[in-house]
């Protein structure tokens, strides 16, 4: 999206002066190729990079293409593909959190749906901001380039803050989910022990009241019951450890993806800044040359008129 804005800025500024050289095509190299393989969401990100690269290869038609609805339509398709991959990942996450209690699982599913809705709203906001920013650029043709650069830098800072805030919020939610899963599993084990405890005591009472053969049977039955109880406790503990490991794996994946998003945002900010600053400096130099030419032309005009009168 930032590259799309940069291409739009280059095109509009180039249209202000006829003798300005065209911006050379930005070569992304192998940076996009690494997203073609891997998880589905990585492939969707690769298609997004491919679209940005295509925008950069436009020359004479770039202004007409960007000012039309084509860019918005292409962005809509990318949003739909990304949301589809998000839904798939959400279903996979819910499957990994399946052993939780139904009440907790329903709450987790509801919160994940809310997070998904916020993500869709953010992407729609990006698309709407593109349309709004495109209109603002058309109205800023006569204003200072410093103001334009300041607006771009401000938007990039806000985008990075939003990514960091969303990543931290997701980490906190995962910590809450892990604590809820552990508490629910421990509560289930305690409930099971409370239900089986009276049965063990009842077996001991029967054993003391009956004769020796019956007492031996009751003792054997009590031993089997205790063995089953211990087995159930061990299984419940193993299940709790398994659930805890699954939650830790999910949390590690999310933290890794959040770190990748942060690094990509920082690299994107530095790359856009390195592209835009040379353009602004070149425009300032050309503007100074144009002002100097106009001043020279104004200074020589009275001299020419005096020569013609003589």
Swiss-Prot record:
Briefly state the modifications made to the protein after translation. Answer: APOE exists as multiple glycosylated and sialylated glycoforms within cells and in plasma. The extent of glycosylation and sialylation are tissue and context specific.
Q: Where is the signal peptide?
A: 1-18
Q: Which residues carry this modification: Methionine sulfoxide?
A: 140
Query: Per the record, which residues fall in region Specificity for association with VLDL?
Result: 271-283
Instruction: Give one GO term, molecular function aspect.
Output: phospholipid binding
Record's GO cellular component, any one? low-density lipoprotein particle
Residue ranges of sequence repeats: 77-98, 99-120, 121-142, 143-164, 165-186, 187-204, 205-226, 227-248
UniProt subcellular location: Secreted; Secreted, Extracellular space; Secreted, Extracellular space, Extracellular matrix; Extracellular vesicle
Q: How does it assemble?
A: Homotetramer. May interact with ABCA1; functionally associated with ABCA1 in the biogenesis of HDLs. May interact with APP/A4 amyloid-beta peptide; the interaction is extremely stable in vitro but its physiological significance is unclear. May interact with MAPT. May interact with MAP2. In the cerebrospinal fluid, interacts with secreted SORL1. Interacts with PMEL; this allows the loading of PMEL luminal fragment on ILVs to induce fibril nucleation.
Q: What protein family is recorded?
A: Belongs to the apolipoprotein A1/A4/E family.
What is the name attached to this protein's record? Apolipoprotein E
Give the gene name. Answer: APOE
